[in-house]
Amino acid sequence: GHFLQHPILAADLCHLLLSLRGNTATYNQIFCTAGPEIAESRTYYEMIADILNVELQINETPVDVHLKENPNSAPFLCHRIYDLAKLKASGAHVPATPLKEGLRQHAESLITSNA
């Protein structure tokens, strides 16, 4: 629950990708991309529980215990934050949907598609 993440809304990612077309400043470049907010994993799941109006239960497992049982998961046990300065400087669309709003939109789309 303590690792930092930098999630992006799929619609923001699509907008970003479309903004690359014809933008020669982005050709042959590699960019990091993410949403505008960084959140601790615990906070991320608290937001989802709040949006769904359900109780959240988090059972933390110490990292060393998890790694011993799941050695292939090592690449995922880290903070995931990104510098968007190069993306912004290129003139491409920079994702701007606030995290809670993006989670709300995503949850609503999943609920309505399964209705």
Model-derived features: where do they sit?
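A conserved pocket-lining segment of Rossmann-fold NAD(P)-dependent short-chain dehydrogenase/reductase
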Residues: 1-8, 19, 32
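A conserved structural motif in NAD(P)-dependent oxidoreductases
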Residues: 5-13, 98
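Conserved C-terminal active-site "lid" loop/helix of NAD(P)H-dependent oxidoreductases
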Residues: 10, 40-42, 65-94
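Mid/C-terminal beta-alpha module of Rossmann-like enzyme folds, strongest
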Residues: 14, 19-72
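Generic structural signal for alpha-helix termini and adjacent loop/cap motifs
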Residues: 20-24, 90, 109, 113
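C-terminal accessory subdomains/tails of enzymes that are appended
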Residues: 47, 51, 70-76, 89-91, ...
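Amphipathic terminal alpha-helices
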Residues: 67, 97-115
